[in-house]
Amino acid sequence: MRRQDREIVDPAQICGILKRSKVCFLSLCDGNTPYTVPMNFGFTEEAGRITLYLHSARSGRKLELIRKNPNVCAAFGTMLSFEDGETGCKATAQYESAVGFGTAEILSDLKACEKGLSCLLSQYESRAAHDFSVLLDRTAVIRVVLDRITGKTNRKETV
């Protein structure tokens, strides 16, 4: 990373960025062409390893690409504020972001799918229990285990 003074490698800080993010931009490989999809997500962290959970319809381009090549990139970001400058060169943004690389898997085990959907919903709401039985026949759950992830920030204070 060029601006090492802005790099974040601490797992707790990276998890904070993910918690504050509302969208995961999942990038897939379509031959030599990248394909990026904005998605809802949830995540877990154990011993510094982050696992993402995403959902999808049970068919479509995204799932076809994962089956062909499960290598993915996931990006997250939040613009905290924008500060005008007297000139364009003096304008700046307060932001935080994270980019991770890993492997995607389309889950087939119903318990794993329920866990993934529960994790996903916990990103956006506090209610603990859900009945996913009516969704599982038409919903695919994708698990992405990140091999590496780094963050970057330009903010005045840390959260």
Predicted regions mapped to residue ranges:
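Structural motif corresponding to alpha-helix initiation and N-cap regions
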Residues: 11, 59-60
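Short beta-strand segments
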Residues: 21-58, 74
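Charged, gly/pro-rich active-site loop segments
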Residues: 2-5, 79-159
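Broad gene-expression machinery/nucleic-acid interaction feature
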Residues: 23, 36-38, 71, 95, ...
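Extreme N-terminal tail/first-helix region
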Residues: 1-20
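Short, intrinsically disordered, mixed-charge
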Residues: 19, 59, 67-72, 118-126
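Helix-adjacent hinge/juxtasegments
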Residues: 61-85, 91
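Short N-terminal helix-initiation segments at or just after the protein's N-terminus
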Residues: 14-17, 36-51, 81-93
